Design a protein with these regions (language model features):
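Cytoplasmic helix-loop-helix junction between adjacent transmembrane helices
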Residues: 1-21
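Helix-loop-helix hairpin linking two adjacent transmembrane segments in secondary transporters
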Residues: 16-64
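Interfacial helix-cap and linker-helix signal at transmembrane-aqueous boundaries
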Residues: 30-38, 121-122, 154-155, 159, ...
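A membrane-interface helix-boundary motif in multi-pass transporters
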Residues: 36-48, 165-168, 248-266
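Juxtamembrane intracellular "pre-TM" segments in multi-pass secondary transporters
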Residues: 65-100, 124
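Extracytoplasmic gate region of multi-pass secondary transporters
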Residues: 94-149, 208, 212
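Cytoplasmic membrane-interface "Motif A"-like loop-to-helix N-cap segments
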Residues: 156-173
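A late C-terminal transmembrane helix in Major Facilitator Superfamily
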Residues: 216-253
């Protein structure tokens, strides 16, 4: 997607992101429904099979953008980046490193939410599994759908004025979501929790919309795929710990406290993103344009 869009890159990626949100809403209900009828193992079998089919289709149908002959020849002459170079680029570029750390914080909170929120609604409000799966996914991803489209447009406009404002927007998005995380973890009124879901989804979209645009602004084009892989791998490796951590907190202090605790992660990450935008972004942005 980034190869096909330059000035509207953030908006293009935001449109792509909406497909993810639609899929989450549908799967949240479908997984609960399948689990309710045939047990939770069946849900894994169904979604695993769909994932395999989807992967095969993507592998067959996705093609790289065709470059002009001169550009293609120059690219072919270059040696392919080694695996370690992707790590080196991310971990020696301050902006990319900060983004990777904060992306990990984003995924940690989202994974914790996706794993435990259906259980929270099921246990605290007496919903059935299908209802808990649907309500925990619908409101937050509906508003994330709207938010990511608005954020994509805003990001492209801000980026044309001052590139560092994209990273600052990511930080403000995380900070704005903090009160809503606390709200959805502490309220005893269902509609108030839904408001928390909505605000959580809408505000986090301002981080997601700029994620790869910011990364590609500070990483040389030949390392884009490697750097993306490093960031995603790191983020989901750390995010995978969230279900375990929240499960331990649930046993010790209750799930409400565990969900509220997630706000601290985004509070710290939001502040770090603002510092990165202020002190590192333009240095890294200008550096690759002189190489």
């Amino acid at each position: 997607i980034a190869d096909y869009h330059d000035r509207t890159r953030a908006f293009a990626m935001s449109i792509h992101q909406t497909a993810y949100y639609i899929g989450i809403i549908i799967s949240g209900y479908a997984a609960g429904y399948v689990g309710q009828l045939w047990g939770w193992r069946s849900a894994f079998y169904v979604f695993g099979a769909v994932g395999v089919v989807h992967g095969v289709i993507m592998a067959v149908r996705l093609k790289d953008k065709k470059e002009p002959a001169a550009v293609a020849a120059a690219s072919a002459a270059e040696s392919k980046p080694r695996l370690t170079e992707g790590f080196r680029m991310v971990f020696t570029t301050p902006t990319a490193l900060i983004l990777t750390v904060c992306f990990s914080g984003l995924i940690f909170v989202l994974t914790g939410y996706l794993t435990w929120m259906p259980t929270y609604l099921y246990e605290n409000f007496g919903m059935d599994l299908a209802g808990a799966g649907f309500h925990s996914m619908f409101y937050t991803h509906l508003f994330a759908f709207v938010g990511v489209l608005l954020a994509g447009r805003l990001s492209d406009k801000l980026g044309s004025l001052h590139p560092a404002w994209r990273m600052a927007m990511q930080g403000f998005g995380l900070l704005a979501a903090v009160p809503f995380i606390v709200l959805m973890g502490n309220s005893v009124t269902l509609w108030v929790i839904y408001v928390g879901f909505a605000g959580f989804g809408f505000d986090r979209a301002y981080f997601v919309a700029c994620n790869f645009t910011v990364l590609y602004d500070v990483i040389l084009p030949r390392y884009h795929s490697s750097a993306s892989g490093v960031m995603i791998m790191t983020g989901f490796a750390i995010g995978a710990l969230a279900p375990l951590v929240l499960g331990m907190v649930k046993q010790a202090a209750g799930l409400s406290f565990g969900i509220s605790m997630l706000a601290v992660v985004w509070l710290v990450c939001g502040a770090v993103m603002l510092l990165g935008a202020k002190y590192f972004y333009m240095k890294d942005y200008n550096k690759i344009r002189h190489e």
